[in-house]
């Protein structure tokens, strides 16, 4: 992702309905986990890293590019630069790895999963969120440097090949999928943009309602997986 997109994302992250809901989902996944050492891969604006810290985790952000690392430091995060397929960490040093909207940027996602397995302690948790459904592929994906969108089957296969057991897999951003599909048909680039506050509030209400509806097995715009390192 270009530096301008990284900074745009960081500016949007605090209030944008999509990022707020993603932080809520992360917080939900942390319930029941004993806090320890965590790595947030692709931290960008640092919202997820702050969620980890707020829940008692000793969290470090990882960014590939200089611009992303600079943004993370400006926001008060402990950050290291590195490649998700060659993490600058020792074996079995972490209890949790978070990779939200990361794998879709990496040509060799098998290598990224294997690296997460290497740095996790036996029984450690790998939380992964990715864009779902190749049918939604559009100019937006190209603009933000995606190389793929995932299905449940191929995401599960990547993680299982990497040495993980799938503990849960769910869709999210389900209710708005028809709107996203329609908009992406005429997309000419990234849809990362600041929204009218009223529109943002309305979309936030829709995505919040999704928490209370049994739709997590329906087709959505994104997938969220909780996986555990097999010993």
Question: Whereabouts are the PLM-identified features?
Answer:
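Conserved S-adenosyl-L-methionine
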Residues: 164-174
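Residues lining the SAM
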Residues: 100-103, 129
């Amino acid at each position: 992702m270009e530096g301008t997109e990284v900074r745009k994302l960081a500016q949007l992250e605090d209030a944008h309905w999509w990022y707020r809901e993603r932080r809520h989902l992360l917080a939900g996944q942390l319930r029941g986990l004993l806090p320890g050492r965590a790595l947030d891969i692709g931290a960008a604006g640092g919202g997820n890293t702050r969620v980890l810290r707020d829940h008692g985790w000793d969290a470090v952000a990882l960014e590939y590019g200089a611009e992303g690392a600079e943004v993370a430091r400006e926001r008060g995060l402990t950050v290291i630069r590195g490649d998700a397929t060659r993490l600058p960490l020792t074996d079995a040093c972490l209890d949790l790895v978070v990779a939200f909207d990361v794998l879709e940027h990496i040509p060799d996602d098998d290598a990224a999963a294997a690296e997460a397995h290497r740095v996790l302690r036996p029984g450690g948790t790998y939380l992964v969120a990715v864009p779902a459904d190749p049918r939604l592929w559009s100019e937006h994906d190209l603009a933000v440097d995606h190389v793929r969108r995932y299905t449940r089957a191929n995401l599960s296969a990547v993680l299982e090949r990497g040495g993980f057991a799938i503990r849960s897999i769910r869709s999210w951003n389900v209710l708005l999928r028809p709107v996203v599909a329609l908009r992406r048909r005429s997309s000419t680039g990234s849809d990362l943009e600041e929204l009218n506050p009223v529109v943002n509030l309305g979309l936030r209400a829709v995505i919040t309602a999704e928490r209370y509806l049994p739709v997590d097995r329906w087709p959505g715009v994104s997938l969220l997986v909780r996986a555990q390192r097999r010993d």
